[in-house]
Amino acid sequence: MRYHAGDYDVIIVGAGHAGCEAGLAAARMGCKTLVLTLNLDNIALMPCNPAVGGPAKSHLVKEIDALGGQMGLTTDLAAIQMRMLNTGKGPAVYALRAQADKVKYQQLMKKNLETQENLDVKQLLVEEILVKNGRVTGVATQIGAEFSARAVVVTTGTYLKGRIIIGNVHFPGGPNSQFPSVNLSENLRSLGLELGRFKTGTPARVDRRTIDFTKMTIQPGDEEVHNFSYISPVTQREQVPCWLTYTTEKTHEIIRENLHRSPLYSGIIEGVGPRYCPSIEDKIVRFADKPQHQIFVEPEGLHTYEMYVQGMSTSLPPDVQLKMYRTIPGMENVSIMRPAYAIEYDYIVPTQLRTTLETKEIIGLYAAGQINGTSGYEEAAAQGIMAGINAALQVQEKDPFYLSRSEAYIGVLIDDLVVKGTNEPYRLMTARAEYRLLLRQDNADHRLTQKGYNIGLVSQVRYDHYMNKWQSISKEMERLKTIVIPANEETNKVLKSLESSEITQNTPFINLLRRPEIKYNTLAGLSDHFLDLPQEVIEEVEIEVKYEGYIKKQLAQVERFEKLEGRILNIDIDYEMIKGLSLEARQKLKKFKPTSIGQASRISGVSPADISVLLIWLEQERRKIAGGDA
């Protein structure tokens, strides 16, 4: 028997990384919000690797933080190791990665949800999204409780019809053998949504007391203090190392001998797996010529013996898992605490979503996270904050909020999903962004904090910090134009030590700083006019000066891009009536319903010639309207 259990503005179904950000965003924007989860103990669960960040992913975390989200702050508090990756490359691809104490991360995020004003958290299984006349009205739960809402965000992760697979054993389940969500999957289908099936997996967790670390290469954290959040204090934290080892020919031999027992090759697994995070058996088959593969052994936290074996994801039977793990140098006597497994799950085909992450067919129904076909905590959290923001704005009857490809990696992620779709678990990479130099992890606050403040998500404390920082950067950039470095013996001695050409006349500091080998602090001692500035200000000044020419070029590219994005296409256009479009273009445009010429140009099968036809048609329509007005 069903009963009415409460009224809310926004309801979030699921409390993983997408659900947490969605719930916090909606509540912080003033909406009465409810987060429903299968298990209160699994809020912000990290069922796979105990880490946050890495290439492109760190950019997402920084952008979430800049908008007023929580992931960066919580990671900084739960981190047990921090490393800046890609420092040998340009700043566009610098990437911060944190090893996190996964239990501490969960506890901190759970507390954030429980103490957030306007937010309730309840342990209930949602089985039905309630819809009336094409508009969402609430949700119904397994025990009969119904909650009304003007917007619902579905963030169910890998729980939709989840199936755990270990060897020839398979059973319904979510991550870490939790309950799956079965009926909700069928309910979404009944609402007219097209679902697909994906697969992912995770390696075994092993007992650190049974590992010989002397046979592995230590991977320590950086001595320099790093943070994901722009407002986290710059303080030293306790750090623990990770370890590097490799598979061997014996490892590969055991895997090859047991491929017939692999669900991946026996037909038990039907879902498509992630291209950029393949299982170890898939790697051995696809890269048969490689004699070894990297394996990273990572701590799951400070208060557990469990170690995560990155690079050894598998669904092979437990006896095979133990045999192959024991062929890894340093793991000859290893004990497995939790076996590796694969998980299959349903996902929503993301081309059914708008850029706001609202479904095209049902008003007020949003989806975010792995349910949209992505992989990764960071991708999920990024979608979560955007869906939460837009759900709140819809309730408040305000204009929707979205980010373009030229504004944020979040914009790249969402645009890829809703325009191109995905036929495998989607992972964001820096290579997917056209304007990488503009979308650096260091300047996410400059790009997004004002936007977050305008919609009511960024706090005054965060906003004041942002304003002070960027005012300092702007002032220092102007000030440096007035500082001149003398052409004397002391200066040239420093330049020579840096293998930089000497100067024969007094030179503006800003000109010297443009040289790749010159750092701000290197020359600071050559003048009496330097200030004691925060490191984040100095780093930003350096980047802006050194890459000024490249930045200007990308800004010009963005201007051209935005012209195409500004040419709006109504979703009710009858493409059959537009002469000159190819058959494939008509089919794709009808299916995906792009909202701009820019979006249309990124759909596979829509050629430059088709775009020209659309531009001509738009101009003809504009003239018709103008003529009618006259």
UniProtKB/Swiss-Prot annotation:
It comes from Desulforamulus reducens (strain ATCC BAA-1160 / DSM 100696 / MI-1) (Desulfotomaculum reducens). GO terms for biological process: tRNA methylation; tRNA wobble uridine modification. NAD-binding protein involved in the addition of a carboxymethylaminomethyl (cmnm) group at the wobble position (U34) of certain tRNAs, forming tRNA-cmnm(5)s(2)U34. Its cofactor is FAD. It comes from the Bacteria. It holds the Pfam family GIDA_C_1st. FAD binds at residues 14-19, 126, 181, 370. This is tRNA uridine 5-carboxymethylaminomethyl modification enzyme MnmG. PROSITE patterns: GIDA_1, GIDA_2. Homodimer. Heterotetramer of two MnmE and two MnmG subunits. Belongs to the MnmG family. Keywords: Cytoplasm, FAD, Flavoprotein, NAD, tRNA processing. GO terms for cellular component: cytosol. GO terms for molecular function: flavin adenine dinucleotide binding. It is found in: Cytoplasm. HAMAP family: MnmG_GidA. NAD(+) binds at residues 273-287.
